[in-house]
Amino acid sequence: MPARILAVDDEPGMLKLLAMIIREKTPHTIETTNNPLEAVQIVRRGGIDLVIADLKMPGLDGSELLEAIRAFSEIPVIIITAYGTEEAAAETREKGVFDFILKPFRKEQIVLGIERALAWSALQRENRALKERLQPPPGV
């Protein structure tokens, strides 16, 4: 079943590139926004399976966006950046990023990151369902 992916970047060219990669190389659908605050609202409405966001954006950067999403959702977030320091990677990992991809990237890196993130998310859902089934019925 195709996933819904949200791409967030303040550069229109990067949004077009991500949309092209996802449409050409995956069965998934993509929604884009250049506004990180709008991205939080889109994710909050539900139906998004994965977020791909730039690290450096005005207003709310990718790390802050990740933190805002983590306040209410555990969907995987992939950060892409041209500013790939160990410090930035460590900070986003502490906040729960799924993957950290450096620009310039190859199309295959994005596709692999997407497929890994969606597979991880499916395993997390399956794990939660199994845990719920293993819970004893009330009163036992």
Question: Which residues fall in each region the model found?
Answer:
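Two-component/phosphorelay signaling modules centered on CheY-like receiver
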Residues: 12-31
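Acidic catalytic/metal-coordinating carboxylates
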Residues: 34-38, 61-64
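Conserved phosphotransfer cores of two-component systems
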Residues: 44-46, 68-75, 84, 95
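Active-site beta3 strand of CheY-like receiver
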Residues: 46-52
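Receiver (REC) domain active-site loop signature in two-component systems and cognate sites
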Residues: 57
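C-terminal output helix
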Residues: 87, 105-115
